Regions:
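S-adenosyl-L-methionine-dependent nucleic acid methyltransferase catalytic domains
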Residues: 1-165
Length: 165
């Protein structure tokens, strides 16, 4: 890939979030153009930053896609970066996109995170990253802006779990 065509957020390449969103919108627009009307597109995406998730959402929405379903791809072994980086995410959301407008809930992002925490039956210390992935998926499916970066969500999850104990 030519550096100019690479879709990344990079200070050294002078590519900020709006540039990233614009380039992603172009990709999703081309996907929509070639995809049959009754077909779906699956996207695997990974980020620990809410602003990047919201750029992705705007990109596929602006291109005419909506989220039909989400799930999380839980890999059995995390990458080195996922293990050593504070605020890293584990469990890449799989996003099933369809042509057309999606739903937009009036729920608040924090209410979604609270619901995911409440419905989680696992050891939170081990699974805060999976809770975050589920939170992202639920926000995408309901058309709600992602408000929590991974690190902020992990701190919030820890506080909520202390209250429960």
């Amino acid at each position: 890939t030519k550096r100019a065509d690479e879709i990344i957020i990079s200070q050294s390449q002078k590519k900020d979030v709006p540039c990233y969103q614009k380039m992603m919108t172009e990709v999703f627009s081309e996907m929509k153009r070639v995809l049959k009307d009754d077909a779906f597109a699956t996207v695997v995406f990974h980020s620990s930053k809410a602003v990047v998730w919201n750029a992705l959402c705007s990109a596929y929405s602006d291109a005419g896609f909506s989220v039909a379903a989400t799930t999380s791809l839980d890999k059995s072994q995390a990458s080195f970066k996922q293990v050593v980086s504070e605020g890293s995410v584990q469990g890449d959301p799989l996003i099933l996109l369809s042509k057309g407008k999606g739903i937009h809930s009036s729920l608040h992002s924090q209410a979604i995170l609270d619901e995911v925490i409440e419905n989680d039956n696992s050891d939170t210390a081990k699974n805060e990253r999976q809770i975050y992935a589920k939170y992202i998926g639920k926000c995408l499916q309901l058309g709600i802006a992602v408000e929590f970066d991974a690190k902020t969500a992990y701190d919030y999850i820890a506080r909520k779990m202390e209250v429960v104990k």
